[in-house]
């Protein structure tokens, strides 16, 4: 069985009750429908993957190279295009160009990895961006309470090391949260209720895949 995955839209968070009447915080994800536009094989492309398309878009907004890809697959253009890597080269045989994928590929109680783009926070200091403790609130500290401190020696090493944590733009990064429980699959509405929070803003694009560390298929 191939590793499963689907593109979707984060609709927001809510809470539901489980069978023991306990409140469970869940993120609502509109999963699919996705269309398989291309199948990559080790013989032809050097790796095994499935290309998925999702979302509506006016054909006039799609450039000619991408329009050619959709035309070759016999599919109307979509807004988003992404590849799902397959761990087993033989798994590509389970997919066909033009095949439609919906929320039904997942089941209640399965575990997934969710990838999205985190919210942008703008320019942030080291305390917010990296969790620095800051400097003393008193005892001679004047206007340095939130400063990071030294970033390197003057004579040795006479430079700032790469990767030194400093102030800068925070957020708007690709983030993956692993091992989230699928609380419920609403096949009628094409919705996944995923326990916990997933990255990104409401209305953002997310990729939901089988949990790799749990060996989910």
UniProtKB/Swiss-Prot annotation:
Name assigned to this protein: Large ribosomal subunit protein uL3
Recorded family membership: Belongs to the universal ribosomal protein uL3 family.
Keyword rRNA-binding included in the entry's annotation: yes
BP-aspect Gene Ontology terms: translation
Residues annotated as transmembrane: none
Species annotation: Mycolicibacterium paratuberculosis (strain ATCC BAA-968 / K-10)
Domain of life: Bacteria
Keyword Ribosomal protein annotated: yes
């Amino acid at each position: 069985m191939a590793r499963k995955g689907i593109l979707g839209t984060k609709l927001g968070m809510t809470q539901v009750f489980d069978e023991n009447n306990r409140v469970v915080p869940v993120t609502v994800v509109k999963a699919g429908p996705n269309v398989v536009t291309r199948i990559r094989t080790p013989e032809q492309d050097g790796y095994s993957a499935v290309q998925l398309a999702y979302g509506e878009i006016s054909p006039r907004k799609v450039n000619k190279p991408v329009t050619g890809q959709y035309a070759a697959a016999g599919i109307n253009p979509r807004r988003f295009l992404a590849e799902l890597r397959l761990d087993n080269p033989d798994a590509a045989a389970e997919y066909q160009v033009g095949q439609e994928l919906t929320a039904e590929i997942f089941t209640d109680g399965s575990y997934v990895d969710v990838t999205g783009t985190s919210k942008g926070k703008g320019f942030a200091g080291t305390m917010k961006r990296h969790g620095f403790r800051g400097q003393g609130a008193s005892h001679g500290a004047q206007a340095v309470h939130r400063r990071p401190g030294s970033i390197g020696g003057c004579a040795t090493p006479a430079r700032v090391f790469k990767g030194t944590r400093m102030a800068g733009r925070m957020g708007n990064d690709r983030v993956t949260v692993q091992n989230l429980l699928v609380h419920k699959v609403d096949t009628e509405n094409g919705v996944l209720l995923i326990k916990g929070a997933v990255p990104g803003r409401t209305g953002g694009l997310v990729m939901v895949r089988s949990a790799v560390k749990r060996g989910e298929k």
